[in-house]
Protein backbone atom coordinates (compact mmCIF):
# COMPACT_ATOMS: atom_id res chain seq x y z
CA UNK A 1 0.00 0.00 0.00
CA UNK A 2 2.86 2.39 0.87
CA UNK A 3 4.52 1.66 -2.47
CA UNK A 4 1.27 2.37 -4.32
CA UNK A 5 0.81 5.70 -2.52
CA UNK A 6 4.43 6.62 -3.25
CA UNK A 7 3.95 5.86 -6.97
CA UNK A 8 0.77 7.99 -7.02
CA UNK A 9 2.66 10.83 -5.31
CA UNK A 10 5.44 10.69 -7.90
CA UNK A 11 2.86 10.65 -10.69
CA UNK A 12 1.17 13.76 -9.28
CA UNK A 13 4.49 15.62 -8.92
CA UNK A 14 5.39 14.68 -12.48
CA UNK A 15 2.02 15.94 -13.70
CA UNK A 16 2.56 19.34 -12.03
CA UNK A 17 5.90 19.68 -13.81
CA UNK A 18 4.42 18.65 -17.17
CA UNK A 19 1.51 21.08 -16.82
CA UNK A 20 4.02 23.92 -16.38
CA UNK A 21 6.00 22.65 -19.37
CA UNK A 22 2.85 22.42 -21.49
CA UNK A 23 1.92 26.01 -20.61
CA UNK A 24 5.40 27.19 -21.63
CA UNK A 25 5.13 25.34 -24.94
CA UNK A 26 1.77 26.95 -25.65
CA UNK A 27 3.19 30.40 -25.01
CA UNK A 28 6.09 29.72 -27.41
CA UNK A 29 3.86 28.50 -30.29
CA UNK A 30 5.48 25.07 -30.16
CA UNK A 31 4.26 22.27 -32.46
CA UNK A 32 3.97 20.15 -29.31
CA UNK A 33 0.58 21.56 -28.33
CA UNK A 34 -2.96 20.26 -28.42
CA UNK A 35 -4.02 23.11 -30.72
CA UNK A 36 -1.27 22.46 -33.25
CA UNK A 37 -1.97 18.70 -33.38
CA UNK A 38 -5.70 19.37 -33.70
CA UNK A 39 -5.03 21.70 -36.62
CA UNK A 40 -3.04 19.13 -38.63
CA UNK A 41 -4.30 15.67 -37.65
CA UNK A 42 -6.89 15.34 -40.43
CA UNK A 43 -4.57 16.33 -43.29
CA UNK A 44 -1.28 15.08 -41.83
CA UNK A 45 -2.13 12.20 -39.46
CA UNK A 46 1.27 10.50 -39.66
CA UNK A 47 3.07 13.76 -38.89
CA UNK A 48 0.69 14.35 -35.98
CA UNK A 49 1.57 10.92 -34.56
CA UNK A 50 5.30 11.61 -35.00
CA UNK A 51 4.97 14.94 -33.18
CA UNK A 52 3.12 13.21 -30.35
CA UNK A 53 5.94 10.66 -30.04
CA UNK A 54 8.42 13.54 -29.87
CA UNK A 55 6.26 15.40 -27.34
CA UNK A 56 6.22 12.29 -25.17
CA UNK A 57 10.00 11.91 -25.42
CA UNK A 58 10.56 15.60 -24.64
CA UNK A 59 7.90 15.50 -21.87
CA UNK A 60 6.34 18.53 -23.54
CA UNK A 61 2.72 17.59 -22.82
CA UNK A 62 0.75 15.71 -20.19
CA UNK A 63 0.67 11.95 -20.90
CA UNK A 64 -3.14 11.87 -20.81
CA UNK A 65 -3.33 14.65 -23.41
CA UNK A 66 -0.83 12.87 -25.66
CA UNK A 67 -2.81 9.63 -25.55
CA UNK A 68 -6.08 11.49 -26.04
CA UNK A 69 -4.67 13.08 -29.20
CA UNK A 70 -3.28 9.75 -30.41
CA UNK A 71 -6.74 8.28 -29.99
CA UNK A 72 -8.22 11.16 -32.00
CA UNK A 73 -5.74 10.62 -34.85
CA UNK A 74 -6.31 6.87 -35.00
CA UNK A 75 -10.07 7.32 -34.94
CA UNK A 76 -9.78 9.67 -37.91
CA UNK A 77 -7.77 6.91 -39.65
CA UNK A 78 -10.66 4.47 -38.91
CA UNK A 79 -8.39 2.42 -36.65
CA UNK A 80 -10.86 2.20 -33.80
CA UNK A 81 -9.07 -0.53 -31.85
CA UNK A 82 -5.96 1.62 -31.57
CA UNK A 83 -8.12 4.66 -30.84
CA UNK A 84 -9.76 2.74 -27.98
CA UNK A 85 -6.39 1.57 -26.63
CA UNK A 86 -4.99 5.10 -26.37
CA UNK A 87 -8.25 6.54 -25.05
CA UNK A 88 -8.14 3.89 -22.34
CA UNK A 89 -4.56 4.89 -21.46
CA UNK A 90 -5.59 8.54 -21.16
CA UNK A 91 -8.58 7.53 -19.02
CA UNK A 92 -6.36 5.56 -16.61
CA UNK A 93 -3.84 8.41 -16.40
CA UNK A 94 -6.62 10.90 -15.65
CA UNK A 95 -8.07 8.56 -13.02
CA UNK A 96 -4.71 8.27 -11.24
CA UNK A 97 -3.91 11.99 -11.43
CA UNK A 98 -7.45 12.86 -10.26
CA UNK A 99 -6.98 16.57 -11.05
CA UNK A 100 -8.69 17.04 -14.43
CA UNK A 101 -12.32 15.89 -14.05
CA UNK A 102 -13.36 17.55 -17.32
CA UNK A 103 -10.78 15.58 -19.27
CA UNK A 104 -11.68 12.36 -17.44
CA UNK A 105 -15.31 12.90 -18.48
CA UNK A 106 -14.21 13.56 -22.06
CA UNK A 107 -12.24 10.30 -22.17
CA UNK A 108 -15.12 8.36 -20.61
CA UNK A 109 -17.41 9.62 -23.37
CA UNK A 110 -14.80 8.68 -25.98
CA UNK A 111 -14.48 5.17 -24.58
CA UNK A 112 -18.26 4.69 -24.55
CA UNK A 113 -18.46 5.84 -28.16
CA UNK A 114 -15.47 3.82 -29.40
CA UNK A 115 -16.64 0.65 -27.65
CA UNK A 116 -20.00 1.07 -29.38
CA UNK A 117 -18.26 1.46 -32.77
CA UNK A 118 -16.39 -1.78 -32.01
CA UNK A 119 -19.76 -3.49 -31.29
CA UNK A 120 -18.78 -3.92 -27.63
CA UNK A 121 -22.15 -2.66 -26.45
CA UNK A 122 -22.01 -3.94 -22.87
CA UNK A 123 -18.55 -2.40 -22.41
CA UNK A 124 -19.87 0.83 -23.90
CA UNK A 125 -22.80 0.89 -21.50
CA UNK A 126 -20.48 0.49 -18.51
CA UNK A 127 -18.61 3.61 -19.56
CA UNK A 128 -21.95 5.35 -20.17
CA UNK A 129 -23.06 4.67 -16.60
CA UNK A 130 -19.77 5.94 -15.19
CA UNK A 131 -19.83 8.97 -17.48
CA UNK A 132 -23.38 9.90 -16.48
CA UNK A 133 -22.31 9.87 -12.83
CA UNK A 134 -19.39 12.19 -13.63
CA UNK A 135 -21.55 14.46 -15.80
CA UNK A 136 -24.18 14.82 -13.08
CA UNK A 137 -21.52 15.64 -10.48
CA UNK A 138 -20.35 18.41 -12.81
CA UNK A 139 -23.88 19.51 -13.83
CA UNK A 140 -22.96 18.92 -17.48
CA UNK A 141 -26.28 18.15 -19.16
CA UNK A 142 -24.83 18.12 -22.68
CA UNK A 143 -22.33 15.42 -21.72
CA UNK A 144 -25.09 13.48 -19.97
CA UNK A 145 -27.29 13.74 -23.07
CA UNK A 146 -24.47 12.51 -25.30
CA UNK A 147 -23.93 9.49 -23.06
CA UNK A 148 -27.64 8.70 -22.86
CA UNK A 149 -27.93 8.82 -26.63
CA UNK A 150 -24.97 6.45 -26.92
CA UNK A 151 -26.75 4.05 -24.56
CA UNK A 152 -29.91 4.37 -26.68
CA UNK A 153 -27.96 3.43 -29.81
CA UNK A 154 -26.48 0.44 -27.99
CA UNK A 155 -29.93 -0.72 -26.91
CA UNK A 156 -31.23 -0.27 -30.46
CA UNK A 157 -28.43 -2.40 -31.89
CA UNK A 158 -29.14 -5.04 -29.25
CA UNK A 159 -32.79 -5.03 -30.46
CA UNK A 160 -34.20 -3.48 -27.27
CA UNK A 161 -36.15 -1.02 -29.40
CA UNK A 162 -38.69 0.24 -26.84
CA UNK A 163 -35.98 0.94 -24.26
CA UNK A 164 -33.83 2.55 -26.95
CA UNK A 165 -36.52 5.07 -27.92
CA UNK A 166 -37.17 5.89 -24.26
CA UNK A 167 -33.46 6.58 -23.78
CA UNK A 168 -33.33 8.69 -26.95
CA UNK A 169 -36.24 10.74 -25.62
CA UNK A 170 -34.48 11.24 -22.28
CA UNK A 171 -31.37 12.54 -24.07
CA UNK A 172 -33.43 14.85 -26.29
CA UNK A 173 -35.33 16.24 -23.26
CA UNK A 174 -32.04 17.20 -21.63
CA UNK A 175 -31.24 19.35 -24.67
CA UNK A 176 -34.71 20.81 -25.14
CA UNK A 177 -33.69 24.12 -23.55
CA UNK A 178 -30.31 24.35 -25.29
CA UNK A 179 -29.55 27.88 -26.47
CA UNK A 180 -25.94 27.53 -27.63
CA UNK A 181 -24.77 26.44 -31.08
CA UNK A 182 -23.19 23.18 -29.89
CA UNK A 183 -26.27 22.11 -27.93
CA UNK A 184 -28.59 22.95 -30.82
CA UNK A 185 -26.43 21.01 -33.30
CA UNK A 186 -26.41 18.03 -30.97
CA UNK A 187 -30.20 18.22 -30.57
CA UNK A 188 -30.68 18.34 -34.34
CA UNK A 189 -28.34 15.38 -34.82
CA UNK A 190 -30.10 13.30 -32.15
CA UNK A 191 -33.49 13.98 -33.71
CA UNK A 192 -32.15 13.06 -37.15
CA UNK A 193 -30.75 9.74 -35.94
CA UNK A 194 -33.97 8.94 -34.09
CA UNK A 195 -35.96 9.71 -37.25
CA UNK A 196 -33.79 7.29 -39.25
CA UNK A 197 -34.38 4.52 -36.73
CA UNK A 198 -38.14 5.18 -36.74
CA UNK A 199 -38.24 5.03 -40.54
CA UNK A 200 -36.28 1.76 -40.47
CA UNK A 201 -38.91 0.42 -38.05
CA UNK A 202 -41.70 1.64 -40.38
CA UNK A 203 -42.97 4.10 -37.75
CA UNK A 204 -43.51 6.85 -40.30
CA UNK A 205 -45.96 8.99 -38.28
CA UNK A 206 -43.60 9.02 -35.32
CA UNK A 207 -40.72 9.93 -37.62
CA UNK A 208 -42.71 12.85 -39.06
CA UNK A 209 -43.49 14.08 -35.54
CA UNK A 210 -39.78 14.08 -34.69
CA UNK A 211 -39.07 15.91 -37.94
CA UNK A 212 -41.54 18.64 -37.05
CA UNK A 213 -39.98 18.96 -33.59
CA UNK A 214 -36.54 19.17 -35.14
Positions of the model-derived regions?
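A "functional boundary" signal
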Residues: 19-214
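Sec-dependent N-terminal signal peptides
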Residues: 4-13
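Hydrophobic membrane-targeting alpha-helices
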Residues: 12-20
